[in-house]
C-alpha cells in the first residue's frame, strides 16, 4: 500500500495492491491517476480502526480513476475534506466478512468531498446503499459534499444523508441504471 502526500503526482498503470489498511491514500494536495489496476483492502471498523481501499482527502487533492477494480470490506473509494475524485470506469464493491455487516460503501463522499461518476459498476453486499453522500447526524445538514452521477451502474440508488436520507439524484440527462446482478467478491 502507499500514501501520496504533499503535492506528489503519481500515475498507477496495470498494478495490483492488496492491503490490510488503505491500498492507496492520496492527501495533502496530491494528484493520482489510475489507469487499470486491482486494489483490495481487508480493513473494517470491527477491529477498532478503518480504511477505505482508496482514499482522497484534503483541499487541492485529486484522484482520477480511468479504470480499476476496487474491493474492500469497509469500502472501496472515499473522498473527503475538500478532495475530489473522478471515476470514469471500473468495478467498486464492498463485501461482508462472515455475515458481520461490517462493510459499507462502494463510494462514500463525506465532509466536503466531491465526486464525479462518469461510469463504472458499484455494489455493496448486504446494504441498501452502494453510494453515500454526506456525514451522519447533525453534520449531515451542513455538509457541502457533492456527487454527480453522470453514468454507471449501481446496486441501488444510494443514500443522500445531506437531504434527509433520500436517494441520490442523478445529474441532468443521466437515467439511473441498476446492476443486472450483484458483484461477487473474487479471491485474489
Per-segment meaning from a language model:
Residues 1-5, 18-28, 41-57, 71-80, ...:
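Extracellular beta-strand/beta-solenoid scaffold signature
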Residues 10-14, 31-36, 60-67, 84-89, ...:
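All-beta strand scaffolds that present successive hydrophobic residues in beta-strands
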Residues 16, 38, 69, 91, ...:
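Secondary-structure transition/turn motif
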Residues 76, 84, 114, 157-160:
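Aromatic-residue detector
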Residues 81-84, 98, 172, 181:
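Polar/charged alpha-helical tracts
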Residues 90, 118-127, 132-188:
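Extracellular/surface-exposed low-complexity segments
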Amino acid at each position: 500500500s502507499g500514501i501520496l502526500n504533499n503535492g506528489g503526482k503519481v500515475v498507477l498503470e496495470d498494478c495490483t495492491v492488496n492491503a490490510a489498511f488503505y491500498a492507496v491514500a492520496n492527501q495533502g494536495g496530491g494528484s493520482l491517476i489510475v489507469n487499470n489496476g486491482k486494489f483490495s483492502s481487508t480493513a473494517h471498523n470491527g477491529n477498532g480502526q478503518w480504511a477505505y481501499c482508496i482514499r482522497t482527502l484534503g483541499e487541492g487533492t485529486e484522484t482520477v480513476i480511468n479504470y480499476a477494480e476496487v474491493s474492500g470490506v469497509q469500502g472501496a473509494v472515499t473522498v473527503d475534506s475538500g478532495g475530489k475524485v473522478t471515476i470514469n470506469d471500473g468495478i467498486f464493491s464492498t463485501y461482508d466478512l462472515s455475515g458481520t455487516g461490517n462493510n459499507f460503501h462502494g463510494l462514500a463522499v463525506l465532509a466536503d468531498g466531491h465526486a464525479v461518476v462518469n461510469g463504472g459498476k458499484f455494489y455493496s453486499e448486504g446494504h441498501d446503499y452502494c453510494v453515500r453522500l454526506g456525514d451522519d447526524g447533525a453534520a449531515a445538514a451542513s455538509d457541502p459534499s457533492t456527487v454527480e452521477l453522470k453514468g454507471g451502474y449501481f446496486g441501488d440508488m444510494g443514500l443522500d444523508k445531506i437531504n434527509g436520507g433520500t436517494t441520490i439524484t442523478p445529474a441532468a440527462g443521466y437515467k439511473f441504471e441498476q446492476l443486472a446482478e450483484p458483484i461477487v467478491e473474487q479471491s485474489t
